């Protein structure tokens, strides 16, 4: 770096610091009075909030058939509508329940290389969230909680019978943000990681009874609309 470049960077940094200080001082002068510490939820707002999102379900392709070396499983990804309901205990602490249903086509992609079947999945997920409130309309949050994955309406491909995927309880992690357009409406982006590893079994015309593990561990990536009552 040349001496002139270094001088330019120092000047730029000094100007930036000055603007930041002036902006902070102006914010202090123009900020409304701080709400009393006893108020648990923003004044005038209900503790209830809903979101409607489009949700991409991106699975991790991993699994096995017991007793079959080199076996592996893959699962189809999907795009679904999703509803979530949140309740704010305070301005920062909330609980969120997501509701939606999806399906996965299951295929053995290792030693056998054949489609196994299809299973529908209802994965209600409850998370406890911390919402950051220091960034104006931009409201990021972090969450962690529990997922219960309920498999239903399972069907088999040719050669397979009696496919059964066990229901599963697992952990969930979450990060996202709302950008509020006004007091009630906003847009949302949300990412969740669901830890889902379960057991499955089925009968095959040639191979007989089969069983194994299905490690799905999906990413749930959603975007949509927020409404705070």
UniProtKB/Swiss-Prot annotation:
Residues 1-26 form the signal peptide. Keywords: Cell outer membrane, Membrane, Plasmid, Signal, Transmembrane, Transmembrane beta strand. GO terms for cellular component: cell outer membrane. It is a peripheral membrane protein. The keyword Membrane applies. GO terms for biological process: transmembrane transport. InterPro entries: OMP/PagP_b-brl, OMPW. It holds the Pfam family OmpW. Its main location: membrane. It is found in: Cell outer membrane. The keyword Ribonucleoprotein does not apply. SUPFAM superfamilies: OMPA-like. Belongs to the OmpW/AlkL family. This is Uncharacterized outer-membrane protein y4mB. It comes from Sinorhizobium fredii (strain NBRC 101917 / NGR234).
